[in-house]
């Protein structure tokens, strides 16, 4: 029995002492950062929604379900099965575009200055990290083989002065889309990171 316990201890030590590659380290950092951004987006949306009247929530949710997020123009997997079939480079490239699409609109989010000041640097850091991962996984492939010159239109008219109702709708749309996109990026980066572990089950 003692011998078996000793053998298991040695095997466990061997597994835990496996070196972590630079790619795994970068992926871990990127996943943690987008997870924090996703949590922040969820909190901001929940706080804004709780400040609305019940009828306002219902109407805005109804309008949002009929609308599109600006980032919907970025071609991405339509479901979890397509996500799992996508290459690591494709998932990274889509994630990069999604993060990039929020660099300017995030400055107009109707949230407190403390939260808004957190978002821009977090997006910038995550974008830099994803770019490093793309470079490490490119292997001679073109970074954005599909529509590399894609230009996204601004989010609604957030740069213009709006009436109270339109301003409310704009804020709801921006926060809901921000939450949706951070969830997408977290999913894509988590699946891409999982691919580094051949024995891992990457089922969503």
UniProtKB/Swiss-Prot annotation:
Residues that, per the record, bind Zn(2+): 35, 186
Disulfide bonds: 69-177, 194-202
Pfam family, one: Hormone_1
Gene3D superfamilies: 1.20.1250.10
Main location: secreted
Domain of life of the native organism: Eukaryota
InterPro entries assigned to the protein according to its UniProt record, in alphabetical order: 4_helix_cytokine-like_core (IPR009079), Somatotropin (IPR034975), Somatotropin/Prolactin (IPR001400), Somatotropin_CS (IPR018116)
Record's signal peptide: 1-17
Keywords: Disulfide bond, Hormone, Metal-binding, Pyrrolidone carboxylic acid, Secreted, Signal, Zinc
Lipid metabolism keyword on record: no
GO terms (BP aspect): animal organ development; growth hormone receptor signaling pathway; positive regulation of growth; positive regulation of receptor signaling pathway via JAK-STAT; response to nutrient levels
Role, per record: Growth hormone plays an important role in growth control and is involved in the regulation of several anabolic processes. Implicated as an osmoregulatory substance important for seawater adaptation.
Family that this chain belongs to: Belongs to the somatotropin/prolactin family.
Descriptive protein name: Somatotropin
